[in-house]
């Protein structure tokens, strides 16, 4: 099994964490988003939208795409440990928390959006950074509201073991740290994040611990 990723890609990081939690070995093929390698014809042949990640199965079948779909595939084919609760309401809550990040918050700060803001709309770097900070924290603030008031919250987003929600929330916090967001307004999120980082699968999947990651982060 192989997957296309990049140290800076938060979506690829979700898949990296899920693979590590499941104990599934997969080779990561780096596609440098900062150099536009995702736009080359050979990668577009794998993923026409030219985004990360993409998962290549050993049977040579059609590549899987979109991090959430890939993670649910992994959860179904490698059920231990489960990333979704057994009960329908629990699964819906976990998916909802995950989608606040993966579907509403993160897509607004990805490289193709930032590049459009810069090249087409001529928005300067400080304003682009402010843009990213806004959308990162809007998602985390919404998650905070759920986690702080709902009884299903435990050591993690849902109960006392990590789920799909924790995978997504942790990567959103990585992004918030990249853009120097003030995370003080989301203490429950940060408590859960710190709990996640005690787990090796999360810790070793940190973007800055991946090959090619710089010693000094730049936006």
Locate predicted features.
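Acidic/histidine-enriched, glycine/proline-rich intrinsically disordered or flexible terminal extensions
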Residues: 208-219
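Phosphate-coordinating loops and pocket residues in cytosolic domains that bind phosphorylated ligands
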Residues: 45, 198, 207
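GST-like fold's C-terminal all-alpha helical module
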Residues: 101-198
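GST-like domain detector, emphasizing the conserved glutathione-binding G-site
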Residues: 1-127
């Amino acid at each position: 099994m192989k997957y296309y990723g990049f140290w800076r890609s938060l979506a690829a990081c979700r898949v990296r964490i899920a693979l590590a939690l499941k104990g599934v070995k997969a080779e990561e093929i780096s596609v440098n988003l900062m150099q536009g390698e995702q736009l080359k014809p050979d990668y577009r042949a794998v993923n026409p939208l030219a985004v990360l990640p993409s998962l290549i199965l050993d049977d040579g079948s059609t590549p899987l795409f979109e991090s959430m779909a890939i993670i649910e595939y992994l959860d179904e084919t490698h059920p231990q440990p489960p990333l979704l609760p057994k009960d329908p309401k629990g699964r819906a809550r976990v998916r909802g928390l995950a989608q606040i990040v993966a579907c509403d918050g993160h897509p607004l700060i990805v490289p193709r959006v930032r590049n459009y803001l810069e090249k087409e709309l001529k928005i300067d770097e400080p304003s682009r950074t402010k843009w990213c900070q806004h959308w990162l924290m809007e998602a985390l603030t919404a998650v905070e509201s759920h986690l702080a008031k709902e009884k299903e919250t435990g050591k993690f987003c849902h109960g006392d073991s990590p789920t799909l929600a924790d995978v997504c929330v942790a990567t959103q916090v990585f992004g918030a740290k990249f853009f120097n967001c003030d995370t003080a307004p989301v203490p429950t999120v940060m408590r859960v994040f710190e709990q996640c980082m005690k787990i090796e699968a999360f810790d070793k999947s940190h973007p800055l611990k991946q090959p090619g990651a710089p010693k000094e982060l730049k936006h």
